[in-house]
């Protein structure tokens, strides 16, 4: 089979002489025009530590593709730093960047008739953005994670960027002074790599490894370690073989492999954002997936790993303990993975895991033994009720009692809620309602790490609930419910909550309820008026116009025609 199935339209024949002329300028020789052209989607950026080491990986991928007998072409794609934009208007662009990344990779690869793509990403939206493009295009592809950051250290404890967010709450509550705040700030992010706990970036990279679109062990490697660059070069060889064999993404991204990915997300205690992203990825791959599927998997999969944000360890500790393959083997041994799922190497999941022990080493406590999990069931629960008729996503970890009924404290923006928390105006038993932060209303569905971290820092993590039509950072934990749908901007019930209303969050019962009569709810709905758009031009205006409900992945290409 020809290896340049797609690129031959720009490299073959007399009419393509001008095309070849330009390719010669970027290094092609006579013998190269019959080779596969492989794109390297390079997320390198000095905006964020998550992506600042990626250029070296792109260069290793380039060398590997050449050695494997194909022609690499590097092109850039963007990133937003969620950690730096957190708590600001800039965070509205974070989820938007998922679509920009997907569109840019699809545009470059399809516009240049590439035969395959190796995508390298670091910060949170790089992963789903790349996978959306890969699923849409359905050309041979592999994802390479830029790698995780190593932990910082202070006073005998490991630090991540979330430590710094929580320190703000501790400082405002008078628990630490200026010196300690600065010490945490200065030590939290010691080098290159994505945020170190089982936050969104590490969650998505782990899920892609479980799904078969990244190489084994690659999702938990440190960005600065030599094995990460070695794994990138190996990924290049695997991709060129996949091009030769025409192993396509939609042969890998199937219902079974997505179930595998979700099972691993539950087992490692991953981010709520994975729900949103996999709904979108499944749609791009023409796989049926709903919120109810997450709930079904949650009910049967335990949380096996003691990882931050609510646990003790970081991703590099998981790597030393056996990484994602060890977690997967435990799930496979107990009938919770589909071993016959194909991977990018051409092997099945069962074949890859054949030599992995069924139980983790007894000399570590990052991965718990099967009979001693962190939680007996998954931590990402799908709640419904009159406040979320389409559903909401709860991450109930690090709290003693997963049920709360309390008075609503209503805020029309993240900033207003944070001001109230830092001013000491939130009391134990309150339920914060942060609304008009959904996909359309924000727009952009900002992450609420600043307020949730401030709550934790103030010592209220066990005593306060928070619901929002926005999202949460993977670094969030506590009694938090996000992705409330329908969102406020389209008249969802969250828009109808009034200060002091009684609200119940009941994770075991999967309930999110506004405790008022149906008659009163109907009266409020009749009086509700949609707010004016916050943006009327530019990318946020376009996004608000196109984006769908979070309950179906907040996609922007639904029902366009």
Curated annotation (Swiss-Prot):
Provide the positions where the record notes the PTM N6-carboxylysine: 125
Q: Which reaction does it catalyse?
A: (2R)-2,3-dihydroxy-3-methylbutanoate = 3-methyl-2-oxobutanoate + H2O; (2R,3R)-2,3-dihydroxy-3-methylpentanoate = (S)-3-methyl-2-oxopentanoate + H2O
Provide this UniProt record's keywords sorted from A to Z. Answer: 2Fe-2S, Amino-acid biosynthesis, Branched-chain amino acid biosynthesis, Iron, Iron-sulfur, Lyase, Magnesium, Metal-binding
Instruction: Give the first-level EC class, as a single word.
Output: lyase
Binding site residues for Mg(2+): 82, 124-125, 447
Cofactor comment: Binds 1 [2Fe-2S] cluster per subunit. This cluster acts as a Lewis acid cofactor.
Which branch of life, at top level? Bacteria
Q: Name one GO molecular function term.
A: dihydroxy-acid dehydratase activity
Instruction: Describe the subunit structure.
Output: Homodimer.
Specify the protein name: Dihydroxy-acid dehydratase
């Amino acid at each position: 089979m020809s290896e340049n199935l797609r690129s031959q339209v720009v490299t073959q024949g007399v009419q393509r002489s001008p095309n070849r002329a330009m390719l010669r300028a970027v290094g092609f020789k006579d013998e190269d025009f019959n080779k596969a052209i492989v794109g390297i989607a390079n997320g390198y950026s000095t905006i964020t530590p998550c992506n600042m080491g990626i250029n070296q990986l792109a260069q290793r991928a380039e060398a590997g593709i050449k050695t494997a007998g194909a022609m690499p072409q590097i092109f850039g794609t963007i990133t937003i730093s969620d950690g730096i934009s957190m708590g600001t208007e800039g965070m509205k662009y974070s989820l938007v960047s998922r679509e920009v990344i997907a569109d840019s990779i699809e545009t470059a690869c399809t516009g240049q008739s590439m035969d395959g793509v190796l995508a390298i990403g670091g910060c949170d939206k790089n992963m789903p953005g790349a996978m959306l493009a890969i699923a849409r295009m359905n050309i041979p592809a592999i994802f390479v994670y830029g790698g995780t950051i190593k932990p910082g250290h202070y006073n005998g404890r490991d630090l991540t960027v979330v430590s710094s967010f929580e320190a703000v709450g501790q400082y405002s509550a008078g628990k630490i002074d200026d010196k300690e705040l600065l010490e945490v700030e200065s030590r939290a992010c010691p080098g290159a790599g994505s945020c170190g706990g089982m936050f969104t970036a590490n969650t998505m990279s782990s899920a892609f490894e479980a799904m078969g679109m990244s190489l084994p062990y690659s999702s938990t490697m440190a960005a600065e370690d030599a094995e990460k660059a070695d794994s990138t070069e190996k990924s290049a060889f695997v991709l060129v073989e996949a091009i030769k064999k025409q192993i396509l993404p939609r042969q890998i991204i199937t219902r079974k492999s997505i179930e595998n990915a979700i099972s691993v997300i539950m087992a490692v205690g991953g981010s709520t954002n994975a729900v949103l992203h996999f709904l979108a990825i499944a749609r791009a791959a023409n796989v049926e997936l709903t919120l109810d599927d997450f709930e079904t998997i949650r009910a049967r999969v335990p949380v096996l790993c003691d990882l931050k944000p609510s646990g003790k360890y970081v991703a590099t500790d998981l790597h030393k303990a056996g990484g994602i393959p060890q977690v997967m083997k435990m799930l496979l041994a107990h009938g919770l993975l589909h071993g016959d799922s194909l991977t990018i190497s051409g092997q099945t999941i069962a074949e890859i895991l054949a030599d992995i022990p069924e139980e983790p080493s007894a000399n570590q406590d990052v991965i718990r033994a099967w009979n001693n999990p962190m939680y007996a069931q998954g931590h990402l629960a799908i709640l419904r009720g009159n406040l979320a008729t389409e559903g909401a996503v709860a991450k109930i970890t690090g709290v003693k009692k997963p049920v709360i009924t309390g008075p609503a404290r209503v805020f029309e923006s993240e900033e207003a809620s944070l001001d109230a928390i830092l001013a000491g105006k939130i009391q134990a038993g309150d339920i914060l309602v942060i609304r008009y932060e959904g996909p359309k209303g924000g727009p952009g569905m900002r992450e609420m790490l600043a307020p949730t971290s401030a709550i934790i820092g103030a010592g209220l993590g066990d005593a306060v609930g928070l619901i929002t039509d926005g999202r949460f950072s993977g670094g969030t934990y506590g009694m938090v419910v996000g992705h409330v749908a329908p969102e406020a901007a389209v008249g969802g019930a969250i828009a109808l909550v009034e200060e002091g209303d009684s609200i119940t969050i009941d994770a075991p019962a999967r309930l999110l309820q506004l405790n008022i009569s149906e008659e009163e709810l109907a009266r409020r709905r009749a009086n509700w008026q949609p707010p004016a758009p916050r943006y009327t031009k530019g990318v946020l205006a376009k996004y608000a116009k196109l984006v769908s409900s979070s309950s179906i992945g907040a996609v922007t290409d639904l029902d366009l025609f």
